[in-house]
Amino acid sequence: NSQIIVNGSRTIWGQQHDPYTFESVPGRSFERECRTPNESVGIVALLLNWEDRTPEIINATWGAVDWYERNVVLDYWFNKSNNGTIEYREGEFLWYRYYNLTNDDYFFANRDSIKVYTIDELEISLKAGYRWAGSWGEALIKESSKISKDQRF
């Protein structure tokens, strides 16, 4: 019930969810309500390995995999040790930490909870002190690419 649906398509999950409404909710001041590939990849792995996969589980799983495939940024990585910069590196897979609930635009937020859309708009201590992007879905999409799209649903 907490998987976020955008324009009729199943995507990924939020970082935190309300236990009653299942809506994405904020955490710390810079952790806005969102969709996040970091926390979602473990859910997808669990669903891919679920023994008695119902049609609902199958749709949830492949909807999320499709989201990862559509939103990967190839040949870039997040260098936290270089003050939190996004840098070119051939062969890398990258997803940003937070995505809007209604579209696939990524964002960041400072401690004042205001969304910003470039990493350079972050406070330097927050920019280098938090994992704003990562390769979280790399193994997932590499493994799932072995299954043709017409066999997924």
List where the protein language model places each region:
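Active-site cradle of extracellular carbohydrate-active enzymes
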Residues: 1-34
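Terminal, non-catalytic domain-edge segments
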Residues: 23-27, 31, 35-153
